[in-house]
Amino acid sequence: MKKTLLIYFILFALLPLWSQHKATLIHADANLYKVDSLLYRSEQLVAEDRAIIKNIPIKSIVNLRYFTRSGDKKIFNASDNIKLINHPLLTWRIKAPEIAQTLKIIREHQKQGAVLIHCYHGADRTGIMVAMYRIIYHNWTIEQAKKEMLNSPYGYHSVWKNLEALFTESTVKEVRKHLGMQ
């Protein structure tokens, strides 16, 4: 009986860790990671990345770049069967409504399969979107998502203090409201 209780206690204690898996590195040169079975993240892809992407079940690519938005069109064509979506964001102007709109786009396209989200470096705009995705859909705490964005090897640029300031209960509440989750 004591052994069974001990096992239950250990399993209960470890339960939160199972939903907090780290993203899996796919290709370091592209800052390409698998977040979960339906979400990947990267920097702006280059022609050499095409073969790697073709071996992953990605059905849509969401480009968050505001400037120079045509990079994906230079790499992928109609025969690749990958939907290319431009959703430009200015790093210094991201607020809860933009986060919610981006998450809606991701969720909508996940109905067809995995989505890759990227910006120029795959660190800042991509980082805040993946962090909020983790909070909203993986039930991560704000602190866990913030820690992943700031301290993981994605290359977050600390100049973007406005992104760090988005890690609040009020921002998450507003994102949920815009998503129709409250």
Feature-to-residue mapping (PLM):
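Substrate/cofactor-recognition hotspot
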Residues: G122
